[in-house]
């Protein structure tokens, strides 16, 4: 087999169920020496062909990746790795497996695939190797002896039982599973009695279907024989275990299998007997016992369940796991994490319950189950699978004619919209995301269902493109309603999404309040996923406030926790925050952290990858490497397009890059866009960059106005990260007009604030800063310079801000010309140049159209112009005054 795998890229182990295909595959894989290792993909519990690729992705350690197909993620991850992938139990998913193999072998030249299946996959280039039964004279006998000694310590094969053991192995065709069943009976039967028991079993099957393949007859003989040895009560329990997939616990068995003919209190005893007779496997899972049926045995049990006419057992199985899922939405205090972990353990049963409901037309129940699992879809990064569940019903015309509760459909549409928003399947705010949310809201209001309404309102807020103003009324109503119906999980989600909007506001105080409120609730219900995000927001608020040490410590702590919990999305955001803080601290470690952020984001794809490149842009800018920063920014931009807020905030970085590269016109446009679309810290930084652009273009009045506006923005919201940059700009501008002492005092105040907050100037601005310092020192002399510097450094931050703003109103603008225009008038000119009407300009500036016309009248008078056309032409000639 090793030789086959060395010469062929696809080898399939074929054979009957129970012949040992999986065991052989594991042994072969364990002996593999491919340098990049192996992965094992267990397809036995998978019932949906659509998640075969996702199952393979999870086997190699890839979580859901927003913004990229699972197949593309697999191709990228495996790439040129020399590795072995084992696809186990392919027979019920042949088409999906074939598609997966074609894609991976075509894209990954060093990948080898070893498959196990009851029949060949049926592909060109496939090498099929049929797994034989064990040698009856030695291997099968050794297996029987080994398994018998486990149930009856001291058992050995001797002269008195060797012939009987040989007979058992021969008549069971050397099939390992059948031999293991037989050996398990040594607890209560001798080998001779076991051999005699096989006589009746084979006679029972002698009249079976002639066309049936031998392997099915042989395996069925073994299982039929084991089944015949059960009591009637044991047989009832055995067949009622058939709906379970991937394992189950005692509580589940009692809920699903017990009934009038099976006392709940006797279930444990009967289950123990089935374990003893090797029809059920008992596993110790972290101190708790879980049970499972081997797949071939489960299929046999399914046939018996079908023959019994007990179809309600499937419904009881579905109802039990639906109730488990529903408990996720009503967690008791600090119970959320435990419930999520339990649901994750039972994910295969939840999948089976959903599949059975959908296949049997129980659409209401299927949608309820999918909606109840929102905490799993979000908290355990199963977002793509969750969306596929909703799409498999909501987008399938076959199910549209089936009656579904309006409230259930409304909630399903809302939950789908939230998943689509998170995955960024379309640009946030796009119609195909907003429309389902709005439809859900209309339906929920129509039926007056509070639970559906609160989900629909939340979805509308989430899908509104991170527009805090647009989302506010939805979130406000949803918050009141969630509190009224005591829906803590949904309330936590509402507070979370409101926090996202607050991040975009750039207000550290508002963000701190939102983060603490949401984190407190998340901690109360035990939702660590949301709690970690809130803590990252707190680190962001600390950064904006200039508390860089605290911001770095908190972001490191949360990143480590996220990594330990395999919470990749939070890990990416944590690394991004670290890289940003380290960049502002001037630490060389920012580059390595940004690299780690990109690597982690690659697992997720989509907007997260854009965030990773944005982190590298910060690190490179801080280090003065404009080329590397441009490369990272160019990689980030197209990815971030699906998230308007991210694009807008990235404009600030692009403005800095353009200016550092000598393109002042592009820098101004980027800065203008950022100033128009941002608030808080983001706007303060954008104004500072625009002031730098104006300085570079020889427009001191414009530079002074923007620098003062940046300073005022920071002072109003207590934002100190970035404030020294504005102070240093004002210092240089003061020196240019002869206010040397004022300029040096501002330099001293800026230096003191940098020392206090650990802020370091980005290296790309060092040359301009040093030029200002040199000019002021030469103008004043060393002694006066040092004295003024010390005076500025002695000022408190508030005193320094007041000092910088003190002379702002004293400077007079000229009566005519471009320099006479106020900041608002310059904004109006710029927007007119962009082709906007007065009405559109009014919307952008949050004023009335009449006010816009008044500004234009003043502009015409100051510039000596008579029309809009003349204004546009003159602005174009000057390169716009803004």
Curated annotation (Swiss-Prot):
GO function terms (MF aspect): DNA binding
One biological process term in Gene Ontology: regulation of DNA-templated transcription
Keyword Transcription regulation: yes
Residue ranges occupied by any HTH luxR-type domain in the UniProt entry: 814-879
Keywords from the UniProt entry: DNA-binding, Transcription, Transcription regulation
InterPro entries, per the entry: P-loop_NTPase, Sig_transdc_resp-reg_C-effctor, TPR-like_helical_dom_sf, Tscrpt_reg_LuxR_C, WH-like_DNA-bd_sf
Pfam families named in the record: GerE (PF00196)
Record CDD domains: LuxR_C_like
Keyword Lipid metabolism tagged: no
Residues within the DNA-binding region(s): 838-857
Protein name: Putative HTH-type transcriptional regulator Mb0914c
Organism: Mycobacterium bovis (strain ATCC BAA-935 / AF2122/97)
Phylogenetic classification of the source organism: Bacteria, Bacillati, Actinomycetota, Actinomycetes, Mycobacteriales
């Amino acid at each position: 087999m090793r030789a086959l795998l060395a010469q062929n890229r696809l080898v399939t182990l074929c054979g009957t169920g129970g012949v040992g295909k999986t065991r052989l595959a594991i042994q072969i894989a364990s002996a593999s020496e491919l340098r990049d290792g192996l992965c094992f993909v267990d397809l036995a519990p998978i019932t949906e062909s659509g998640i075969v690729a996702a199952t393979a992705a999870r086997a190699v350690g890839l979580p859901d990746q927003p913004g990229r197909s699972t197949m593309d993620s697999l191709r990228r991850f495996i790439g040129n790795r020399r590795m072995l992938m084992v696809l186990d139990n392919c027979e019920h998913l042949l088409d999906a497996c074939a598609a997966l193999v074609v894609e991976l072998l075509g894209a990954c030249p060093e990948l080898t695939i070893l498959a196990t299946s009851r029949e060949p996959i049926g592909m060109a280039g496939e090498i099929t190797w049929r797994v034989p039964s064990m040698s009856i004279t030695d291997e099968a006998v050794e297996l029987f002896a080994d398994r018998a000694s486990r149930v009856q310590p001291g058992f050995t094969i001797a002269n008195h039982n060797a012939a009987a053991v040989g007979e058992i192995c021969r008549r069971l065709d050397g099939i390992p599973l059948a031999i293991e069943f037989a050996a398990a009976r040594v607890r209560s039967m001798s080998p001779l009695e076991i051999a005699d028991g096989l006589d009746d079993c084979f006679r029972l099957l002698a009249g079976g279907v002639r066309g049936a393949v031998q392997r099915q007859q042989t395996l069925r003989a073994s299982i039929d024989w084991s089944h015949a040895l059960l009591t009637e009560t044991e047989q009832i329990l055995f067949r009622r275990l058939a709906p379970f997939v991937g394992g189950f616990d005692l509580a589940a068995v009692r809920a699903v299998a017990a009934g009038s003919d099976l006392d709940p209190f006797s279930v444990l005893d009967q289950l123990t007997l089935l374990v003893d007779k090797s029809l059920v496997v008992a596993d110790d899972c972290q101190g708790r016992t879980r049970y499972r049926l081997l797949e071939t045995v489960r299929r046999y049990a399914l046939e018996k369940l079908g023959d019994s006419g007990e179809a309600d057992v499937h419904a009881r199985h579905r109802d039990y796991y639906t109730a488990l899922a529903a408990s996720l939405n009503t967690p008791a205090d600090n119970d959320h994490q435990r419930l999520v972990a339990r649901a994750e353990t039972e994910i295969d049963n939840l999948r089976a319950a959903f599949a059975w409901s959908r296949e049997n037309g129980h659409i209401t129940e299927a949608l309820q189950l999918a909606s109840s699992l929102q905490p799993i879809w979000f908290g355990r990064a199963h977002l793509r699978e969750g969306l596929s569940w909703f799409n498999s019903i909501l987008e399938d015309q076959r199910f549209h004619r089936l009656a579904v509760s309006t409230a259930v459909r409304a909630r399903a549409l809302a939950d789908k919209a939230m998943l689509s928003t998170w995955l960024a399947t379309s640009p946030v705010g796009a119609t195909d995301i907003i429309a389902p949310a709005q439809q859900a809201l209309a339906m929920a209001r129509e039926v007056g269902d509070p639970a559906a309404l609160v989900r629909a309102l939340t979805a509308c807020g989430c899908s509104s493109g991170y527009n805090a103003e647009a989302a506010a009324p939805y979130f406000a109503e949803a918050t009141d309603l969630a509190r009224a119906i005591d829906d803590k999980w949904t309330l936590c989600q509402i507070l979370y999404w409101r926090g996202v909007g607050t991040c975009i506001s750039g207000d550290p105080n508002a963000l701190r309040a939102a983060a603490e409120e949401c984190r407190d609730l998340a901690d109360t219900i035990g939702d660590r996923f949301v709690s970690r995000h809130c803590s990252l927001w707190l680190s962001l608020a600390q950064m904006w406030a200039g508390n860089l040490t605290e911001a770095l410590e908190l972001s490191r702590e949360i990143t480590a926790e996220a990594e330990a919990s395999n919470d990749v999305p939070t890990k990416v955001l944590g690394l991004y925050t670290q890289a940003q803080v380290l960049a502002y601290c001037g630490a060389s470690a920012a580059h390595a952290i940004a690299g780690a952020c990109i690597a982690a984001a690659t697992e997720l794809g989509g907007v997260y990858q854009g965030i990773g490149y944005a982190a590298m842009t910060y690190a490179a800018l801080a280090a003065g490497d404009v080329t590397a920063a441009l490369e990272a920014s160019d990689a980030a931009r197209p990815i971030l397009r699906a998230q308007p807020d991210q694009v807008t905030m990235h404009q600030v970085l692009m403005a800095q890059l353009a200016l550092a590269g000598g393109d002042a016109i592009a820098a101004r446009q980027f800065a203008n866009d950022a100033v128009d679309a941002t608030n808080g810290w983001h706007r303060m930084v954008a104004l500072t960059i625009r002031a730098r652009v104006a300085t570079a273009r020889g427009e001191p009045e414009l530079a002074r106005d923007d620098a003062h506006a940046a300073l005022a923005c920071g002072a109003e919201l207590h934002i100190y990260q970035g404030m020294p940059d504005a102070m240093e700009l004002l210092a240089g501008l003061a020196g240019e007009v002869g206010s040397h002492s004022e300029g040096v005092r501002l330099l001293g105040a800026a230096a003191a604030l940098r020392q206090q907050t650990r802020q370091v100037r980005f290296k790309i601005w060092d040359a301009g800063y040093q030029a200002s310092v040199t000019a002021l020192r030469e103008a004043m002399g060393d002694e006066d310079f040092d004295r003024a510097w010390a005076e500025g450094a002695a000022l408190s931050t508030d005193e320094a801000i007041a000092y910088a703003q003190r002379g702002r109103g004293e400077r007079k603008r000229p009566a005519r010309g471009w320099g006479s225009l106020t900041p608002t008038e310059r904004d109006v000119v710029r927007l007119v140049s962009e082709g906007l009407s007065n009405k559109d300009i009014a919307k952008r500036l949050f004023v009335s159209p009449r006010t816009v016309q008044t500004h234009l009248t003043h502009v015409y008078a100051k510039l000596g112009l008579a029309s809009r056309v003349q204004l546009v032409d003159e602005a174009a000639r000057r390169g716009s005054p803004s």
